[in-house]
Curated annotation (Swiss-Prot):
One record GO biological process: cobalamin biosynthetic process
Name of the protein described by the UniProt record: Cobyric acid synthase
Annotated GO MF terms: ABC-type vitamin B12 transporter activity; catalytic activity
Coiled-coil ranges (or none): none
Disulfide bonds: none
InterPro entries: Class_I_gatase-like, CobQ/CobB/MinD/ParA_Nub-bd_dom, CobQ_GATase1, CobQ_N, CobQ_synth, GATase_3, P-loop_NTPase
Gene3D superfamilies, per database record: 3.40.50.880, P-loop containing nucleotide triphosphate hydrolases
Keyword entries, A-Z: Cobalamin biosynthesis, Glutamine amidotransferase
Active site residues according to the UniProt entry: 330 (nucleophile), 427
Pathway: Cofactor biosynthesis; adenosylcobalamin biosynthesis
UniProt-listed PROSITE patterns: GATASE_COBBQ
HAMAP family: CobQ
Length: 481
């Protein structure tokens, strides 16, 4: 099968970025290439062209490949709902919620849909670049594995192991992985990469040779730190944790415990007229905030309780009294209303949770999940909007008579009577340049000529150039068989 797999010595070593860059490099070689991640765990999901959902990292990799995202690119997606359980998405569709112990019993059965999706991709493309999850060194998770060596051995896909030198101990990461995994698993590893190097790469020559000597693996390169990665859609909410920009207008966003689809904020953090700040648990909402954003969440009622535990409900009311603006997106929109009812217990115990009361609307959860890409117009400015909806529940009430947008002929969202509180189910709205400028101008912010989608394309090309300079890309892609 024409595939090669990038696994890592741990989480956050840069696997997703490496795969995106390799996909773009392969595409520029004239290859039909597709990304594939057997299993992902993320509340940051993308709606696919075939009406399902996958991890947003795979959607970015699809973009790097010149493809529309498809459910086959990430056949198993786990969306954490609590510390002990996750919603399970198989080939784009919700199949239920499992506690961690139940997941480990059920996951071996998911190898069949994983292989089915993989087979469709390999049949349709010259090359498939596979991304692992976490680390194969977590040998306590090896039984029934579908994400790393369990998949690689079953599908016969060679592996390149990536280590992260930025966090230190990369020699131990790589050599140690070989030491703890089964010999049959180790035999699948054809080589290694050292990622996120800072400084003079020549200073690591001895360490690089030592890894080759200790493991017998071929080194495919040392990849210097790529700072432009900050301009790509964030894969982890922590990527947005550092305040960005020094603009006159301050946007604060609330870091819920189950925050989802937080890459809605990416275009804002690149606007020079804004200062974008994450409000972490235990911190107050800054008094200087002009706009407070309540982002999406995987657990609306749970994160409403979390919000109140931080005192953010009090802060939000004070912010509103001072004349501040509030925007709720998806789950954040649901929180802004008078109540959130979950009669079937879709997010926990059945019941009704009192909302923040900043919008005169009510939400009722129901099991039918809305997964769709949409286009329309912002009601206030007339600017074109594009984005996607990914939610359960329906929201109704008097403030819906003042919709945020017109989406494909229907009103969407709600606006308070004073016009300072807005809610919408539309993710990705700030990627639409015209709307973003109009919205920010309505807040009094200085806007720029940022063309967000074009910038993402430029950065993906720069990432491919970066890998071509520092990695034996031709040799690595030649491993595919």
């Amino acid at each position: 099968m024409p595939a090669v797999m990038i696994q890592g010595t741990g989480s956050d070593v840069g696997k997703s970025l490496l795969v995106a860059g390799l996909c773009r490099a392969a595409r520029r070689r004239g290859l039909s290439v597709a990304p594939f991640k057997p299993q992902n765990m993320s509340n940051n999901a993308a709606v696919t062209a075939d009406g399902g959902e996958i991890g947003r990292a795979q959607a970015l990799q699809a973009r790097a490949s010149g493809l529309e995202p498809l459910t086959d690119m990430n056949p198993v997606l786990l969306k954490p709902e609590s510390d002990h359980g996750s919603q399970v998405i198989v080939q784009g569709r919700r199949v239920g919620t499992l506690r961690a112990r139940d997941w480990f019993e059920r996951k071996p059965a998911l190898m069949a849909p994983v292989l089915e999706s993989f087979a469709r991709l390999t049949a349709a493309h010259d090359l498939v670049i596979v991304e692992g999850a976490g680390s194969p060194a977590e040998v306590n998770l090896r039984r029934g594995d579908i994400a790393n060596m369990g998949f690689a051995r079953t599908a016969g896909v060679p592996v390149v192991l990536a280590g992260d030198i930025d966090r230190g101990g990369v020699i131990a990461q790589l050599v140690g992985t070989q030491a703890v995994i089964d010999p049959e698993d180790a035999a699948m590893i054809a080589g290694f990469l050292v990622n996120k190097f800072r400084g003079d790469v020549r200073l690591f020559d001895e360490g690089y040779r030592l890894i080759e000597a200790r493991t017998g693996w071929r080194g495919y390169g040392v990849v210097p730190f790529f700072p432009e990665a900050a301009l790509l859609p964030a894969e982890d909410a922590l990527d947005l944790g550092r305040p960005t920009g020094q603009g006159a207008l301050t946007v604060a966003w609330l870091a819920f415990s189950r925050v989802a689809n937080f890459d809605d904020l990416d275009p804002l953090k690149q606007e020079p007229g804004l200062t974008v700040r994450m409000v972490r648990p235990g911190q107050p909402i800054p008094a200087e905030a002009d706009l407070v954003i309540l982002p999406g969440t995987k657990s609306t009622r749970g994160d409403l309780a979390f919000l109140r535990a931080q005192g953010w409900d009090v802060d939000l009311r004070a912010h509103h009294r001072r004349g501040g603006r509030v925007l709720g997106i998806c789950g954040g929109y649901q929180m802004l209303g008078r109540s959130v009812a979950d009669p079937e217990g879709l997010e926990g115990a059945p019941g009704v949770t009192e909302g923040l009361g900043l919008l005169d609307v009510e939400t009722v959860m129901h099991p039918d999940k809305r997964l769709t890409r949409v286009a329309g117009r912002h009601r206030a400015s007339g600017a074109e909007l594009t984005g996607y909806e990914i939610h359960i529940g329906a929201t109704e009430g008097p403030d819906c008579a003042r919709p945020f947008a017109e989406i494909e002929g229907r009103p969407e969202g709600a606006t308070s009577a004073d016009g300072r509180v807005v809610g919408s189910y539309l993710h990705g709205m700030f990627g639409a340049d015209g709307f973003r400028r109009a919205f920010l101008e309505s807040l009094g912010a200085a806007t720029s000529d940022l063309a967000y989608d074009a910038r993402v394309e430029t950065v993906l090309d720069a990432l491919a150039d970066h890998l071509e300079t520092h990695v034996d890309v031709a040799g690595l892609l030649a491993l595919a068989r």
